[in-house]
Amino acid sequence: MTDHYEINTIGVLTSGGDAPGMNAAIRAVVRTALANGLTVRGIRRGYHGLLREEIIEMSGRDVADTIQRGGTILQTARSQQMRTPEGQLKAASILKKYGIQALVVIGGDGSFAGAQKLSDYGINVIGIPGTIDLDIACTEYTIGFDTAANTAMEAIDKIRDTSTSHERCSIVEVMGRDAGYLALWCGIANGAEYILLPEQHGYDEQAMINDIIEKRKRGKKHYIIINAEGVGDSINMAKRIEEATGVETRATILGHLQRGGSPTVKDRVYASIMGAKAVELILEGKTNRVVGYQDGHYIDFDINDALKMNKEIPEYQLDIAKIL
């Protein structure tokens, strides 16, 4: 059995937007902790639930038959109160009240920012990256991205079928307010004619319209445009393109469809290993870390350093997308 460094009780919560694979991570945290003699307290509805003391003790039975389920069994929510010093102090006090000596937070940058604030009040926090946006800079992988990308890819394949039949231009809006990884990967996987990303800081709509008109003259009959939600309104974009080109254009917003569904093998396995890694870090006495994956290895970063990192889409991926 691992040396516990006087740790006997840990907590786990999911925060922010849900992502497929979160249950696999929760399951791994609980099972690894129990295997090492720790007590696990699950916190429902993220920081919102923490501030309301929605805290339960978890057993192996609580995570049985959950690895294949989408969403999060602990549920999730966003909390404005947690953004305030008063809320952060209250949250830390509640954790101490329940004897929680270390907290595992599964979520994105916003969730990690909340965790970092808790560390200022003496709470040991360990972050696990869970977001379909793939926008956490310290890791090449985030829980949920693979499932969301596959869900979107399958939907776009179906949209192309009907777009081809009706000789239409189809705009498909995928999630990604500030990050375009989902749009880029789906654009490459689906052979989209155009991919619009927030990282491009705007796009030349007139050039795209001119290109559609020119390709129409050469005999091309259908088009797929992948639009990340942070770029602009897909419905009005469709109206403008149809008016300018004469090509019937429809917009489809995939929305929260991308967050649901049974996680892929990759999301289940990576989430499971990250969950186990988080508990191992606690048992090793490490504090205030974020679990990550880089170059084939599971690693960890100081949470303060992780939050300072910026993630940019590699130029070669953008270049490949233009060619393909």
Language-model features, listed with the residues they occupy:
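Short, acidic/small-residue loops that bind anionic groups at enzyme active sites
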Residues: 41, 119-144, 196-200, 253
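Short glycine/serine/threonine-rich phosphate/pyrophosphate-binding segments
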Residues: 19-29, 51, 85-86, 100-116, ...
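Phosphate-binding loop/pocket of nucleotide- and phosphate-handling active sites
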Residues: 245, 289-324
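Accessory alpha-helical/coil subdomains and C-terminal extensions
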Residues: 105-107, 113, 117, 124, ...
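Flexible, glycine/charged-enriched surface loops at secondary-structure junctions
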Residues: 38-44, 162-169, 221-225, 248-254, ...
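N-terminal phosphate-binding or glycine-rich loops at protein starts, especially the Walker A/P-loop
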Residues: 2-51
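Glycine-rich oxoanion-binding loops at beta->alpha junctions
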Residues: 2-3, 50-103, 110-111, 143-150, ...
